[in-house]
Amino acid sequence: MGVAFDKCDTRPAHIDAILNGLDRYNPETTTVFQDYVVQQCEERTFDCYANLALLKLYQFNPHLLQPETVTNILTKALTVFPSPAFSLCLALLPAHTQPFPTADTDASQSSDFVESIQKLARLSTLLESAQYAQFWSTLNSDDLYADLVADVAGFEELVRIRIAIEVGKAFREINAEVLEQWLDLRSREALEKFVTEVCSWEVDKAGPNGTVVKVPTNKENEARSEVKSERVGVEMFGRVIRRGFEQAA
């Protein structure tokens, strides 16, 4: 059973009190939420509900918006893909920051903040579409990306784990070279350590197609046939025939 959207096991009591009271609409609480974002970045936690509350305050009070806090929230949202977290956060930002053309093109092009938002949106698209090798290539292609993820402790490791989770849902066996690219692990030793210690998977070096990584069977990657049957009672045909005569009349 999934966790409720507005719940977070690591949420401090004072943040929970704000979210469940009228103070969540008080502009003075923005500094409290901003400090909480810093805490999430340092402690590798993510509280989507609290972050959305802060972005909503920014929406109502644009003069309070802190670009660095916003980019940190979006960067943290990347570490919990696949989920609607990034899209929900993005939807609360000003229209000129959105990753599509706007009427105010000049303003969009001249803003470092807007460029940062659009670069993060690009990373989100690559992750959500399972273009993992392209994600790492893009992330490593520009120093701005390094600056954007610098405040988020363990960003690469967190994303790597999420990618591994998705791979585990779709594969029972995968070529080691492919997985190296998807996880951006640039040596076979690093890959073997990650998949065995973090994922508890197996490495088979004696396969006919080279080294492969074997994923244990789970409810997502297990191949099984599904037979569906529907029972149609006689009374259902009676209703259909009766309606046909009623419409004709």
From Swiss-Prot:
GO terms for molecular function: ribosome binding; RNA binding; translation initiation factor activity. InterPro entries: ARM-type_fold, CSN8_PSD8_EIF3K, eIF3k, PCI_dom, Transl_init_fac_sub12_N_euk, WH-like_DNA-bd_sf, WH_DNA-bd_sf. GO terms for biological process: formation of cytoplasmic translation initiation complex; regulation of translational initiation. Keywords: Cytoplasm, Initiation factor, Protein biosynthesis. One of its GO terms (cellular component) is eukaryotic 43S preinitiation complex. SUPFAM superfamilies: ARM repeat (SSF48371), Winged helix' DNA-binding domain (SSF46785). Pfam families: CSN8_PSD8_EIF3K (PF10075). It is found in: Cytoplasm. Residues 46-222 form the PCI domain. Component of the eukaryotic translation initiation factor 3 (eIF-3) complex, which is involved in protein synthesis of a specialized repertoire of mRNAs and, together with other initiation factors, stimulates binding of mRNA and methionyl-tRNAi to the 40S ribosome. The eIF-3 complex specifically targets and initiates translation of a subset of mRNAs involved in cell proliferation. Belongs to the eIF-3 subunit K family. HAMAP family: eIF3k. Component of the eukaryotic translation initiation factor 3 (eIF-3) complex. This is Eukaryotic translation initiation factor 3 subunit K. It comes from Neosartorya fischeri (strain ATCC 1020 / DSM 3700 / CBS 544.65 / FGSC A1164 / JCM 1740 / NRRL 181 / WB 181).
